[in-house]
C-alpha cells in the first residue's frame, strides 16, 4: 500500500465516529436503492406469475399444425420450449343442473403441458394414458354432477354450432333463443366428430381455458407425442427463446414455415404484457419512471450526506495534505486519496446496504402482501414475494457507487488544489471579520454571555453549516408535506363509501336487451349470496310546508308560498326482496300489489355533509318529510323541461329508515318510495319515450368473496358495453388499503431519508465540535463551568435548529397550501395546517440537533484541558 | 505569608514499564507577592507542574493548596470558578477565542462570571498593554506579541492572587519579550500578585526573586536570589 493510501486509512481510523456514520449513510442509501429496485422487480414478477396462473406459461400458440411439421416448429431457434395440445371439443353433460353449463370441454396436452398450462391438481392424479382425463372441479361445483375417480365418461365430442349452422367459437357462453311465447330455449347443438370413452383419474382446479361463463366445464387428457400419425394435427404452445418485441414477427414467420398462416398464431398477451413485451407499453414505462424518480431523490439525499463527509474530511486533512504536498505529493495523488476514501467506504457500505435492502424489502413485502392483494386483484395463490435478480443487484451497486463518486468528486478536486501554504495558514480564521461575527448587544443582555458566544460561533461557520441546514430543511419539508397530504387524504376518504349496503352493483344502460336473462345468469353464480333486482326513476313531489321536515326546509327554498317541490326516487325491487323488506319494515307485502290504488314504502332518511362558516364538514342525519302511513303524494316523473308533467297519486304504506339492498341514503332534498314491480310497471306504463329511457335498471349483489365474484361477472359480461360493474366493497377496501400501503412506503421512505439527514447533521455537528475542542478547553481553562458550557451548547443547538425551521417551515406551509388548492375541486374544506405534525417536526428538529450536540460534547466535557490545548489540529 | 503550597505532587503518564513520571514527589511553597522562575530542560515536567497548580490538569497524587484550599477536592464547577477568580494562566500559544474581540477576550473571566467589566480598570489595563487602539480587533488581526499581551490582559483582569505564565515569551522576538516581562513584573510589584513563570531564558530567570530548577520531575535546586 502506498503512503497516500495508508495516510487516508489512518485518518479514517482517527475519525472513527464520522467514518462509521458515513458508512451507515452509504448503507442506508444503498439499501434504499436496492429496496426500490427489488420492489420493482418483485412487483413485475408478481404480475408475471399471476398471468401464468391465469393463462399459462407460454408466449404464443400456433394452431392446428400438421404432425409432419412439428419438428419445424419445435426445433426452430426462435423457440425455447414447446408443448403439444389438442382440442377435442365439446360433449353434452346430460344431467347438468346449471342452465349455462351444459357441456364438458376436453383438451389434451403432452406430459410437460400440464405444468406449462398451469393445470392444478385438486385430487387424484393427472392423466398418463390416452384414455384418461382429469375433470374440472366446476363439474361438481357448478354443474352439480358428482363424478368419482375411476368413473367412465362416454363422450360424443364435437364442435358447437347454432341451430342454423353457424360455428360458435370456443368459450362463448351458452346460446339461448327466445321462442314465440317468450320462453328461452337452447339455440345451439353439437356436431359430433368422435365418440370416445375416458376414465376419470383426477379432479383439477378450473383450467386456464375454462372461464366462469363458459358453456363447457373443462377436462384435460393426455397426449402421447410419439403416437401421432402423419395425418394428425395439434396446437403447439411455445415459449420464445428471445423474449422481446421481435416475437411479433418471428412467430408468424415460423407459422408460415410450418404451413400455417399468421392468423393461426395467438399470443399470450396477458403474460407478454407483464414481461414488457407489448406493442405499446404504458404500465412498464410508468413503473420504470416511478422507480427512477425515487432513486433520484435517494441519490440527492445521500449525496448531500456523503459529500459533506468528504468535504469535512478534506478540510480536516488540509494541513496533512498540504504537508504531503510540500514534500512532493502530486495533484493526482492528493485527489486519489479522496477517491480512495470513497472506495474504502463503498466497499464496506454497499454490500451491507444491499443485504439490508433485500432483508428490509423481504420483511416489508411479507407484511404488506395481504393488503396489496385487495388492491391489485391477483389469483388467489399468487402472492408478492421478494425476487432477487443479478440485474437488480448490479443496478444497486452501480447506482450506489455513482452516489459516492458524485459526492467525492468536488472534495477530491479541492484536495488536489491544496498547496503547502494552506497547511501553514488557517484559511478560515484569516477570513473572519468583526462584521461577520457581530451580534446584537441585546442577545448578551437577554440570554447571557453563553448565548452570545453560541451565536457568534454559528455566524462564524456559516458556510460549513449551510449543507446541514439544507438537510434539515429537506427532511422537514419532506416530512411535513407527506403528513399534510396524508391528513388531507384522510378527510377525503372518510366520506366516500358511507351508506352502501351492497357489495357489487351491476347496472344496465337503457338499451340493454335481454336484461332478465342476464339477471338470471348473474343470480345463478355460486358466489352470489343474495341479490336485488331494481328499477328506479326520479321525479318530484309537490308538498306543503308542514309535510316537509325542519332539516329539509333549512336546505330547500319553497317554489312559492308554503309549497315545496322535492325530489323523489320511485324504486321497484323484485318480489322476493320486497316481501322480506316489507317484513322488516312491519308492513303487509300483499297490500302493495294493487295497481288501482298504488302504494309504496317511504324511506324518509337523509344524510348530508354540511359546511358552515368555513368550518369543518359536519354530518347531518334526519327525516326528509313529515309524512305518515296513509298520506298520499303526487309523483311526477321528470320529463325534460316539461313542468306540466302528468302526476300519479301514490299512497304511503309505511315510513321507515330501512333501505332494501342497493338503495342509497338520499340528501335532504329527496326521498325514496319503494314499490313492487307490478306497481312500478303500472306507473311507468304510460311514460313517454324519454321518460322510459330514464328508468335505471340494476342488480345488486352481496357476496362473501367480492373479488372472485367481480372477476366472474367480468368474464360473464365480457364485451357487453351496456353493463357496468361496481365493486363497492373492493373499492372501499382498496381505498383503505391504498392509504395504508402508501403510508408504509411513504413513511418508510421519509424515515430512511430522515435517517440520512440525521446522519448528515450528526457528522457536521460533531466534526464542528471536534474542531473546536481546543477552543472549548480554552473556555474551561479560564473558568467556564460545566453548567455554562451546557448552556452555550444548548443555545447553539437552538439557534441552529431555528435556522433550519426558518427556511423549512415557510416552504412546508407553502407546499401545504398548494396541495390544499389542488384538492379544492374534490371537496371544499377550509385551509388548515396539520398542527400536530408541525409541532412534532419542530420538536424533532430541535431534539435531533440538541441530542447530537450533547453526544458530540460528551467526550469533550470530560477531557483533560491540557490534552485538548496541546492538540495542534493536525 | 504563604499563598501556595504543593505537597508530594506526582504525575504519571501511562502505567507499568512504560510509565513516565512527569512529576515525582514535588513539594514546595510560595509566599504572597513572590516572583518565582521555574527553569528546566524540555520534558522536565515544569509545564505539567504549572498546569496542575493552575487547576487545568490533575495530579496522580499529592495536594495543592491555594490560599489554604486544597483545589483538587473541589468539584468541577467550583474548580472552574477557582480558575476564573483566583488564577491567571498565560500560555505559550495565547489560546484566544477567535470569535471574540480583544476587549471581550480580556474580560472573558468577568463575562463568565456575568459581571460587567469596570470601564476605568479596563481602559487602564488596555493602556498598560498597549492595546487601546486594538480593542475591537479579532485575534487573527493581531501580531503574535499583541495576542500574547491580550492573553496576559485576560490573566490580569480579575487581579488574581496567583499568576502562572508558561513560557510567555517563547514565541516572541527579544523586544517583545522584554516588554512582556517588564509588564508582568510591574503587575507583580504593583498589585502584590504572586507570579510563577516558566522560562528557558537565563536573563529572564535572573529577574525573579527565586529560581526553582526542575529535572526529571524533581526539584533539583531552589534558590532565593533576592528578598
Per-region residue spans from a language model:
Chain B
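ABC ATPase nucleotide-binding domains
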Residues: 226-227
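ABC family nucleotide-binding domain
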Residues: 2-214
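H-loop (His-switch) and adjacent beta-strand-loop-beta switch element
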Residues: 211-223
